[in-house]
Amino acid sequence: MLWCPSVLVPLIAVAACLPVLAIGTPLEWEFAITLKSKILFVDEFWRTLASAAHEFDELSALTFDETEELIYFNDQQHRNGSIFSLRRDALMASHIAEQAIQRTGNESVGGLAYDPLNRNLFWSDTLQKKIFFASIDSKVTETPKVLVDLSQEGARPDGVAVDVCRRKLYWTNSNITHPTVESIDLAGTNRQVIIDTDIDMPRGIVVDQLSDRIFWIDDLKGVFFALKSARLDGSDRQLVLHDKHHEPLNLAVTNDAIYWTDKTTKAVWSHPKVPIVKATTTTSPLKAEEEDATETIPDIEPEPVAEVSALLRVANLSEEARGIVARTGFYQRLQKDEHCANIVRKVKERLDLMTKKKQMRSLVDEKTAQLERDHCLNGGTYIADRVLCICPTGFKGSRCEIRECHNFCVHGTCEISDRAYPKCYCQPGFSGERCEISKCSGLCLNGGHCKLEDISEKPSCECPHNFAGERCEQNSTEICALFCRLLKHEADIYVPFGCHDICEELAKDASDKIAIPQYHHLEVCMTPSPWTSNVIIVLVLGIVSCFFLVAVIVHGFRRLYKPKRPRIRKTFVVRKQARTNSSGDTPLTNRPLATEQCEITIENCCNMNICETPCFDPKLVEQTLAKSSNCKEDKKILIHNMDDDLY
């Protein structure tokens, strides 16, 4: 990112071209960014180097004086001051913030710019709709002067930028009904509207002395935004980038890139200065070649270049990113520029003159001047008759050699209070009169690790093994040892469950003093068995149910598919005395008399009480009737082989 032309003197070239600057040099930072409550300094690789201005609450715009290494910034909520200066002492790694412009009302600074030649600050007030300026050499209480009054026009001045070489001020009018980009001489004359078409809501603006162009941010309608550039007179307008979902506020330009802050993503983005699309109207190449053509060819809409846009997110921030400035080194690079060489020479002459004024003293009293120069330091007033120094605010010592803020704040920014005492504004995570106390200091005991995840919350402790509590102050080993000692004497005392292993370990060395708690079902809790009584009961019931279901199914199939045995009913008539009505009558063909015979089915033969006549085997009836039989023989032939003779 650093550019080293061959025309530079060797000392400047070495200072600017070193890739890693020595620690403590004033040129160690490349970009400064205002967040809501601090100013962030980063190097060319966007590594955070330091932060400052922690005592302020609502920072917005800022500008940078490269000649004297001063940052000028605005605080929207400070009660006394509106614009402040910040001098960063890299050798001391400290920052000194001083009030530059007093607050006059409820002003709201939109943009801030600095003229190093006349040492004037210019800023836009979005509430009063005016552009003010004031000299930093004037008294703080002096009222700022109005350069441009836009209140009657309904305009809303936003970003401002100074063209040091051509002595002009540029500003953007973000009134969406009639947005413009305008310029005026630093003397307050020759006001011009250089751009008033094809813009929606221009915000931040910057003058690039290296390319003689202006760059500005245009907050387009909807979710879109654009980065645009033009020559200093408004011609040759170019569209550098057209994108969406950003809310850009301010921008800075280096030799090869543009950087801007975005409130939506809380980040800083960059893009090359090479334009992607030409915003001016283009014509057909044929029209340029055919100069004598009578027919005009309609304008062709610009088309984007086929290359992919090199949009890059260079920094992620913890708060809203607002203002941004970059170190350009244009005083060294533009010493031979036709427009800037004269201004650079005058600035150097002014710096030399300031140095000489600091060294010059009145020749009227050479002794007093010599004493002031040698004895009283840092602007102290020498009292000759008392031979002492009256030190200015912020210094002390017999020769005013001690800066009261020097090494006073360990982790913070020092500022001299209204009572002339140093006061520290601590960085997040620190407190104390000198910001020497860390919120984590001495908090965690017994080797605990302190964590501070959120600045607004209390720090917490991560405790090692066998320690607990907010500060890791509770030793579980000692607590369990007390319980187990009491258990040795009182068997019914309750011992926490987690103490079993600890007491078991302690009992190895002092078994006579330590008792090991015996918990019910400890083994079951430690190694639980799956075969519980409930599981066994459910398993047995399931098996029995399965067997019963199988039996029912088998029986059903047997009933369904096995044929029934036919039931055959036979009736036999038994009689004791047959009638001899004819020659063909036989005992089996003639029914006996009612008193002498009995009719019975063969199935009921076993039920002997149905009739008085017993059952006889049919095959033997005829044989027995022809013979004389007795009672014993009748019993022998009763139901003889009846099952075999039914069918």
UniProtKB/Swiss-Prot annotation:
Glycans are attached at residues 80, 106, 175, 316, 475. Keywords: Cell membrane, Differentiation, Disulfide bond, EGF-like domain, Glycoprotein, Membrane, Oogenesis, Repeat, Signal, Spermatogenesis, Transmembrane, Transmembrane helix. Residues 23-534 are extracellular. The keyword Nucleotide-binding does not apply. InterPro entries: 6-blade_b-propeller_TolB-like (IPR011042), Cueball_EGF_LRP_Nidogen (IPR050778), EGF-like_dom (IPR000742), LDLR_classB_rpt (IPR000033). Residues 556-647 are cytoplasmic. The chain crosses the membrane at residues 535-555. GO terms for biological process: canonical Wnt signaling pathway; oogenesis; spermatogenesis. It is a single-pass type I membrane protein. LDL-receptor class B repeats lie at residues 119-166, 167-211, 212-257. Residues 1-22 form the signal peptide. GO terms for cellular component: plasma membrane. It comes from the Eukaryota. Disulfide bonds join 376-389, 391-400, 440-450, 444-461, 463-472. The keyword Transmembrane applies. It holds the Pfam family Ldl_recept_b. It is found in: Cell membrane. SUPFAM superfamilies: EGF/Laminin, YWTD domain. SMART domains: EGF, LY. Residues 365-401, 436-473 form the EGF-like domain. PROSITE patterns: EGF_1, EGF_2, EGF_3, LDLRB. GO terms for molecular function: Wnt receptor activity; Wnt-protein binding. Has a role in spermatogenesis and oogenesis. Belongs to the cueball family. This is Protein cueball. It comes from Drosophila pseudoobscura pseudoobscura (Fruit fly).
